[in-house]
Amino acid sequence: MDDASERAIEEDMLDQFNYFDDEDEELIDRREPASLDSFDLVDEEPDEDEGESTEPPQSSRLNSLLSRAPMHHGVRAGALHMKTDWHQIVTAGDELAVDAPLTDKSSIICRTGMLMLASGTGAWRVRDTMNRVADVLGVTIHVDLSLLSFECTCIEDGHCFNEVVSLPTTGVNTHRIWMMESFLKEIETYGRRFTVHEYHEMLKTVESSKPDYAPWQQGLAAACACGAFVFLLGGGPIEMACAFVGAGVGNFARSHILKQGLGQFSALTTGVALACVSYLLALLGLGQVIPGAMSHQEGYIGAMLFVIPGFPLITAGLDIAKLDMRSGIERLSYAVSIIVMATLVGWMVAECVGLAPDDFAPLGLSPLALTLLRVVMSFVGVFGFSVMFNSPVKMAAAAGLIGAVSNTLRLTLVDAPTMIPFLGLSTGMPPEAAAFIGALVSGLLASLAEVKLTYPRIALTVPSIVIMVPGLYLYRSMYYMCTFDTVNMLGWFVRAVLIVAFLPVGLGVARTLTDPRWRHTS
């Protein structure tokens, strides 16, 4: 059967489904919808003269056409999220962007917002970025943001255009945030001279940028960060060494799985499970050469702290502070989901292999030695987390210096009676208040560094206070819940929630004091 016959049959099929006669002008003359029986494509009683035809009956040809339709069962080979080819939707690419049609201006604005949202930054920064681009293009916009999507309405000269953009997943990329900041400075200076295609070429450069670090480098960064984290929690050399191995293996596996395009929770559970098992194997290995090494099992919690969602937790609080409730609640829900999944997997593995979150043994260090080591380990921890967020080395070092000051100050305030004995204090500052002060100091120092180094403020503040997130408290609360110890579970949970709540409050206060645009609602 040739192509012309197939097209004729397809047109006949479409004509059968025309319920109404388009040529009739009056409603009374329209045909009534036919019953479903009349649409039987397979004629069970063929006419007598059909038997004399040399061509196959029409019903057979219809069945042949329908059988050729592609059928999809099981796993699809392609991605389920459709990717936008921005160059194909541009109508006036060689025209200056300020004089382009509203649809082309909307594509520039929405692509800019998409790249910022995909970088993991908060709703206020995404909206601010889109507003600045729209201001250059002479467009008024209204944006409704969530964790993975936004709806943007563009208004210009009495015309209105609405566009929706969605992402397949979320993550953190501070280097891309920095690139977008440079892009904004460029267009705010020369943006009226660029064509639509030139805008999209600049945005394509940002979008196609590769991660700065390979999975093994991400694993090494997590190993250093979690090893330092264990010391700051009170662990010793054995716990630090085993956490180094566990976190390195776990985050390497997690980064490799994410690089393959698999789901975040699959990577999360695999990474946490491997981290706990690797910690135990490293502990067994040390037990062969160090007597009593098996008594240092409590450090396994530190091996899984690389999954703590510091960026979503902090940006959720900042979004809620700016009344971006939809984005803030979704980010908070996402962060809580990660914490719950990670702690459940950690508890399950710990129960299977016999690990328990006991208290760390005292190290017996002098106040001066402890303070100096806290400064060093805070720097190492923040530097490692910054690398995990894809910060360039210099940016990670700047965040590490800020974290070394603010986190050491926080820990010193909590342990004031022993760290500053000449003050004669009987008790230290509550951890919640100390977390607020630490976050406030991080925000103020980041404001100074932003002026000198041109790094985005959020790329410095969030990594510097991620190390203050009470991952140990969160895990212990879930552990005691799974063991039905309600009293301990509530105690650790309330402590963790209060500390997490005060961290974005401290950053928000610092931002309010130093950023006029943040202070005002419009």
Each model region followed by its residue ranges:
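Short juxtamembrane and helix-loop transition motifs at transmembrane-helix boundaries
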Residues: 197-210, 223-235, 254-262, 353-367, ...
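Hydrophobic alpha-helical hairpins/lids featuring a short glycine-rich hinge
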Residues: 166-243
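Hydrophobic alpha-helical segments embedded in the membrane of multi-pass proteins
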Residues: 220-224, 244-252, 272-273, 375-381, ...
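Alpha-helical membrane-inserting segments
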Residues: 228-233, 249-257, 273, 277-286, ...
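C-terminal transmembrane helix-loop-helix hairpin of multi-pass membrane proteins
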Residues: 10, 15-20, 29, 34-39, ...
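Core mid-bundle transmembrane helix pairs that form the ion/substrate translocation pathway
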Residues: 269, 297-303, 314, 327-383, ...
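Core alpha-helical transmembrane segments of integral membrane proteins
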Residues: 211-316, 386-389, 393
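Soluble N-terminal domains of membrane-associated systems
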Residues: 1-197
